[in-house]
């Protein structure tokens, strides 16, 4: 029975942001708000969720960018049995080492989207900034700063729990021995050196293992190789060509077209090389994402 865990998550998010959909009203969400206010009991909430909670979710689940994904994680059997049947593809997900990071990644995307809706703007208009001390993405508004989500959680979706540089396994789970670092691709020492790009911008942030970030032979204040620069370009293009909530922020920082973004990265590389001189690269420890 998915009704209780599904509605539990929604109720928790409704406590943070009442705006969870683009439409102005929802009978289902209104019922969850009543539960949060203590006006209906758990059993009634779960029954309402069974009737109303999955009307649109199940049909849309396998649709990405207007297309149906090839692997289906469940089969809709509501007409015959009143439920869904999980496929082997679903169970295969939990055999992956990076499955420990799934929940944090989903929560990060959810927080980015609902924050935009709360502010009353389209997701594409949200400009996300980074707090390098707290490793938080935040949004500045007229009423002050709004913390959105962990930068590690938001960035890990593209890297699939692998170090951006060496592809070794990384984790975004606190207290993990493999906990990653948020790293500046172009070193943050460039902030004071008339660098053409915003060094703390999302376009320049990647997740790295401790060895690449600050271990013996790590990157430190060196300039990543052209091979790694190409990897950064591909990462940023992934965000720019998707419906990811960080898309517009990266485009505003690097350029609205592929040509502009290519020239921007090359300009940044040339500037960094002139100022820092030394290149850096690393041998891969795993397969690429």
What are these regions (language model features)?
Residues 149-181, 209-212:
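Short cysteine-rich loop/turn motifs with clustered Cys
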Residues 221-289:
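C-terminal structured domain segments
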Residues 2, 143, 147-154, 158, ...:
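Conserved aromatic-histidine-acidic binding/catalytic patches
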Residues 129-148, 176-194:
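Short, charged low-complexity linear segments at domain edges
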Residues 1-147, 223-235:
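Mixed-charge, low-complexity interaction segments
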Residues 17, 162, 239-240:
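Short secondary-structure junctions and interdomain/linker hinges
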Residues 167-205, 218-231:
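Histidine-centered nuclease catalytic patch
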